[in-house]
Structure formats: C-alpha cells, structure tokens
Amino acid sequence: MDSENTILSVDVEKVIRGKSPRLADRLPRFVINFIKRLIHQDEINRLLSDNRDYNGVELATRILHDLDVTYNVHYSGSRPDPSGRYIFVSNHPLGGLDGMILISYIGSHFKDVRFIVNDLLMYIRPLAPVFVPVNKYGKMRHDNTRLFQDTFNSDAQILYFPAGLCSRLIDGKVSDLDWKKTFVTKAIESRRDIVPMFFSGENSGFFYRLAGLRKKLGIKVNIETFLLPDEMFRKKGSSFDLYIGDPIPYTSLTGEHSHKEWCDIIRQKSYAARNQTR
C-alpha cells in the first residue's frame, strides 16, 4: 500500500528536494506547508487516488469528468488524417486544464500521443506515459534529450505549447508570451505537418496582477505559477472551446522565411482559428 501511495502522490517537499536539496534544507516547515496548501496538494492527490486505475489519456479524461469540465471542438477546415504524423500547437491560456483537454481530445482520436512539458510535471507519475520532459531553467539531462529526439522521430502525435509558459496579460489582453521556433525546426527535421489550434479561456485577475507585480519588482522567478493549481480548481464546472485550423504541410515551410518567421506566422494562424470555424 505504501508503494502504491508513493506512485500516486504528489509531494511538494520531495519535488523541492529533487530540484534543490540545499533549498529544501533551508525552507522553514511553515513555508513548505503553505506551498502545499497553495497548490492544493491534498486535493490533487485525492484526484489521483480516486482514479488510481487510470493513467495517461484515460486519466486526463477522468480528471476532467471529476472536475465537471467540458469542452467543444470547432474545425475551420479539413481534419487531420488519422494516418498522419503531426505536431499540434496551441496557445496556453490556463496552465493546466488546457493541457488535460488536449491530451483527452487528441488522445481519443489518435492511438499514441506525447506532450512536451516542463520536467516538473513528471512528478505526476500517472500522467508520465504521455509526458516528454524538458528543463526550462537549465540544461536537459542526456536521457531526456534522447527521449525528446526519439519522440519526434516516432509515429506518436505531439502536443506542444510553443510559448512554454501560460498566457499573461499583455497590453490589456490575455495573450501568449513569445513563441519559440523549436516546433518549426523539429517539424521540418521529422517531416511532420503542423496543426494550429486556439484554446479559449483565461485565469483570474489576481493571477495576472501578481504576474505584473512580480515583473515590476524585477523578480525573475515566475512565482505566479504556484497559483495554477488553484486556478484549475476554481474552474470546476466550466466549459471551454477548442478551435482547430487546417494542417500546415511541413513541405510548405520553405526558405522564403526563417524558422522564427514561420513560427510567428503559425502563431497568427493559431489565433485566427477562432474566427474561421465552420
């Protein structure tokens, strides 16, 4: 039983110690307990425990069910060919539920899906079968670098948030941060077509105010991300919209534009998908 709980549980203290043993030793107990409450550790572990018989795509679907979260999907053109190999790219407005919905929906239409994620999410062990970890704050481990490359060379469908972090309030509008060009480079290298998507939704005003304050104070650590689990639980009973645009052939990503220029063009197509559905 203890072994099973270890597999299922998210443990903030263990995560901190895994990333920085020195920090874990220096943090007062009341700070660790505060972080546990802030990220809803007990509620997350209850969700995982209640669904202990599921993992990967099935678990994502069960979590959405338990949170009473629904979604509608709108296509603007042709649907991806079930026999194709794709990189599905999307804006990242929520920081949690948007990923769960993409895993559930794309995973229900394709046999094998992989999601490129922050390596911290690997601590959610039951979702690890669909996660491919990247280190956003340092060098990637050699085995993770190999897994990253092997994933693009495989037949699995790939889910990707090119911004890396969830959306922020920019010039009064909720919008993604700069998209990184990696997905364009990997699409060309691995001969994968790209499917642009737009996901509706936003976080609370407090989340964006804290992000703005943190930036004004010159704090580099994205402390607002600690609020993302709370943002997820706040959205119980919510419904979202996912807009899916026409697949973009990798053969069309020619030298007339740089990879970064293609990245920005595809970002525009992603945001435009919400206005072009049939």
Language-model segments: which ranges?
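Short, flexible loop segments at the rims of nucleotide/cofactor-binding pockets, characterized by
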Residues: 63-69, 134-140, 172-173
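Short gly/ser/thr-rich secondary-structure transition/capping motifs
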Residues: 67-74, 140-142, 224-226
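Non-catalytic C-terminal accessory region of glycerolipid acyltransferases
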Residues: 2, 12, 145-278
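Membrane-anchoring hydrophobic helices of lipid-metabolizing enzymes
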Residues: 1-89, 99-101, 110, 128
